[in-house]
Amino acid sequence: MTSFTNILLAVNATWLTLSVGVTIFLIITLVLVAILLVAKKYLVHSGDVEIDINNNKKITTASGKTLLATMSENGVFLSSACGGKGSCGQCKVQVFEGGGEILPTEQVHFSRKEQKEHWRLGCQVKVKEDMKIGIDPSVLDVKEWECEVISNKNVATFIKEFIVALPPGEHMNFIPGSYAQIKIPEFEMDYDKDIDKSLIGEEYLPAWNNYGLFGLKCKNTEPTIRAYSMANYPAEGDRIMLTVRIATPPFKPKPQVGFMDVMPGIASSYIFTLKPGDKVIMSGPYGDFHPIFDSKAEMMWIGGGAGMAPLRAQIMHMTKTLHTTDREMHYFYGARALNEVFYLEDFLNLEKEYPNFHFHLALDRPDPAADAAGVKYTPGFVHQVIYETYLKNHDAPEDIEYYMCGPGPMSKAVEGMLDSLGVDPSSIHYDNFG
């Protein structure tokens, strides 16, 4: 009996110890929760905050979101080609007060000098308190509209000319070479079912079938934003025209055939499904890739692929609107083959109308289709053609203004060629959205 009593006493003592321990743990937990709630109430701004922009515009807004999203909700549209993921580095603002310390994700986009000048990425800065920021004044002129698609046809095998109309009565003031942004909603699409084959065109459908593009599918799980250079120039009216290349997955390594199991580009897939009458959200204008108008220097445009867009806008404005005849102007465009070249007739007609404008077509290799059509071209990569046919015997390549937009490898090759000729980097102007 004594032994049993001792066991009961021991068990009771153990339970008492456990109960006391659990009680103390619960009390400590409740105290910590209370401290956190008090800290949140007094240290974290959960109500409205005031954002002072450029010392002359103030907005009162809710806290909690990124500065990029907060500004957009209040009608101030920062550029963000990556949709706020911190990779493009375009949503630059100066944060003079509020915003906390710069994050590692931001530091890669700024020099030490820029960091000392308070430059930040709007997509990485959380709005938690009153802020004082600085932005490019031109950003305040950016507008956002619901636009209507009026045309979306292929102009090359993998490139669409995408045109939308601004709402009635709306107008966008822009300088040729600017770009626009398009909002990409959540969607799920099947290339075979959701892309209108009549808008691809009979000329390009065989290539689409041969490459198996209609077997692709795409899904976007969250809204995002993408940037595209505008191909239109101001005199063409209240519309936005883009040239969009379909971003296919990489091909499988040889001898395999077909695409790798990677989703195609979200933005281009979405745009390729759009039909006349559809509505899209666009904003603009953005960018500083503009011609130098108060100059008499020779101008050379260098493009490839969908990089045609801003170069067409600049060239058409310099000729059709400004009627520039006192500057030598050359446009070198590179493509794999003739069926990848678009707006060819426009530039050939400009040559006839303006003796100071010259169009030069470079095709990667001899092209029987171009030969049969009587189209003048030079075989070779565009940087080689520029050097061999023009700059090699030019008196002063360093005095030319260069405007370039196209695939990365093309740009790198042109940069190297120009550097070998002593051209200063400041004479080379780029558009990063080709």
PLM regions: where:
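Fe-S ferredoxin-like electron-transfer domains
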Residues: 32-38, 108-170, 190
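Residue-level marker of beta-strand positions
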Residues: 90, 132, 179, 276-279
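Reductase modules of NAD(P)H-dependent flavoproteins
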Residues: 2-84, 95-116, 320, 325-434
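A short, basic/flexible loop-to-alpha-helix module at the beginning of a structural domain
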Residues: 270, 283-297
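Cysteine-centered iron-sulfur cluster-binding motifs in ferredoxin-type domains/subunits
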Residues: 80-89, 122-126
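Ferredoxin-reductase
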Residues: 148-276, 336, 362-366
